[in-house]
Amino acid sequence: MKERERVLELVKKGILTSEEALILLENMATEKDEKQIEKAAEKVDTQNIGTTNKEDQVADLMNALEKGESEGPTVDSFEENTQDSAEKDRENLERILDELATKANRASAELDEVNAEIAGIKEEIKEVAEEIGTLDTKEELDALTEDEQVQRKDLHVLLAQLEEKLATQSTEKTALEEELKNIRKEQWKGQWNDTKEKVSSQFSEEWKDQATDTFNQVGGKVAEVGGQVGEFLKKTFNSFSDTMNDNVEWKDIKMKVPGVATTKFEHEFNYPNPQASLIDVKVANGTVVFKTWDQEDVKVEAKIKLYGKMAGDSPMEAFLERSDIDVDDETISFQVPNKRVKADLTFYLPKRTYDHVSVKLLNGNVLVEELTAKDVYTKSTNGTITFKKIDATMLEIEGVNGEIKVLEGTILDNIIETVNGDVSISAAPESLSVSLINGDIRITAKEKTLRRVEASSANGNIKLALPNDLGVEGQVKTNLGSINSRLTDIEVVREKKDRGNQQLHFRRVLEESMAQINASTTTGSIFLKDTDK
């Protein structure tokens, strides 16, 4: 049944008055055409003046509106105007949505470009920072040249420029993201309004009221059920937690935490018959081992580990790009100053006397199983240094954290300096100087070739064993420790045992050989004895 016929039927039954019917008919038009409907109603009302029957008045009005007898616009024309207006509104909405979509596509494309530029800048920053880190490591290894110092300054300038550019691009990215967010919000609003109008036009107000009540009831039920489920889950998890705590020893559980991606590989470097007499090894992270063999070739067994992603067609290529390896008839040079590369190197050297050997490590151990050289310098910031057998004119060892051992060999001058770690000497140096801050010093002299010993430790004991057929002139002292001597055939020249200051001056005179001994410690004790005891 049409809406107008229903209104007329209600008037006939006396449910609605003519005034109420007129108001209801006026509300059937859109808000935009209300004034036109009022004019039409007034016109129809004027034509029906004198009619005393309210039912006839409403009927005449309905006939006038349906048949178009009035001079003003009819209800059908109003509906057509309303439809035209709605169509125009829809077209405007679609046009606005198209414009918003165009703006969104443009902003999205610009954002993609900015993101690509930011990714490129970050990659450049990463490469520059890696180069700077490599040069810094070279400086720590005392291998930085003047040209590399200039290069490092230029790299720092470039890094600052890249960081400034990155900040600018990041600001632009934030602005584009905000713009795109606002556009998406406007698009959503437009689409939602369009959808809401389409949906609303399909259902009556009565149905919407019923649906609202139904959804409210359902929502209440869902909330009630959700509360019950939440309470159940809470009780379940609490029970599970108590059970796990009572029955599981968490200290026995080991969990693997994802770390930096690593690449491992092994490679063997072979160099046929080089006549090099200089060896230069500098490694940021790794272990260096020297061995000698009966062949004239040089072989280096390398175990490499690369930390993180590195550019290169292969791990070997990535390693070579970050290393400087050169072996010829003058020098055997292996330099791996990159801290993202760990290189465990084992050198097999021909048996000969080398002029100069230099080994410098930041983190790692040095092991020399056998070596003959004129001048040997070894340094490790964090790691142990061990010489099993070394024959050298000069052996200089420098450490920071780690134990130092010189077990066997003949050395003319031996200088050892370190901060933290014990020092043990059982080789046969003629001149020995040991200085450390925290750690014990143990010197065992087996040959009468010893001529001088200088040993000092701030916090640690000093143990010195001397051959009983070696003439000595010694002075030892400690502030907070004690002096204990079991040397035979010695003459005590002077002894002081004051609290906080103990000293001993002793002498054993033998015409064949004499050695000068000086040892001091602040908080430790000094122990003297014969080597054979």
Curated annotation (Swiss-Prot):
<protein>
    <recommendedName>
        <fullName>Putative adhesin domain-containing protein LiaX</fullName>
    </recommendedName>
</protein>
<keyword id="KW-0964">Secreted</keyword>
<feature type="region of interest" description="Involved in cell membrane remodeling">
    <location>
        <begin position="289"/>
        <end position="526"/>
    </location>
</feature>
<dbReference type="GO" id="GO:0005576">
    <property type="term" value="C:extracellular region"/>
</dbReference>
<dbReference type="GO" id="GO:0061024">
    <property type="term" value="P:membrane organization"/>
</dbReference>
<dbReference type="GO" id="GO:0046471">
    <property type="term" value="P:phosphatidylglycerol metabolic process"/>
</dbReference>
<dbReference type="Pfam" id="PF22746">
    <property type="entry name" value="SHOCT-like_DUF2089-C"/>
</dbReference>
<keyword id="KW-0472">Membrane</keyword>
<feature type="region of interest" description="Binds the antibiotic daptomycin (DAP) and the antimicrobial peptide human LL-37, under physiologically relevant concentrations. Protects the OG1RF and S613 strains from LL-37-mediated killing in a concentration-dependent manner">
    <location>
        <begin position="1"/>
        <end position="277"/>
    </location>
</feature>
<feature type="coiled-coil region">
    <location>
        <begin position="83"/>
        <end position="186"/>
    </location>
</feature>
<comment type="function">
    <text>Involved in cell membrane remodeling, perhaps acting by negative modulation of the liaFSR and liaXYZ gene clusters, thereby regulating content and localization of anionic phospholipids. Binds to the antibiotic daptomycin (DAP) and to cationic antimicrobial peptides, such as human LL-37, perhaps functioning as a sensor that activates the cell envelope stress response.</text>
</comment>
<dbReference type="GO" id="GO:0005886">
    <property type="term" value="C:plasma membrane"/>
</dbReference>
<dbReference type="Pfam" id="PF13349">
    <property type="entry name" value="DUF4097"/>
</dbReference>
<feature type="region of interest" description="Putative adhesin region">
    <location>
        <begin position="279"/>
        <end position="526"/>
    </location>
</feature>
<keyword id="KW-1003">Cell membrane</keyword>
<dbReference type="InterPro" id="IPR053959">
    <property type="entry name" value="YvlB_N"/>
</dbReference>
<keyword id="KW-0175">Coiled coil</keyword>
<dbReference type="GO" id="GO:0046677">
    <property type="term" value="P:response to antibiotic"/>
</dbReference>
<feature type="region of interest" description="Disordered">
    <location>
        <begin position="63"/>
        <end position="89"/>
    </location>
</feature>
<dbReference type="InterPro" id="IPR025164">
    <property type="entry name" value="Toastrack_DUF4097"/>
</dbReference>
<keyword id="KW-0134">Cell wall</keyword>
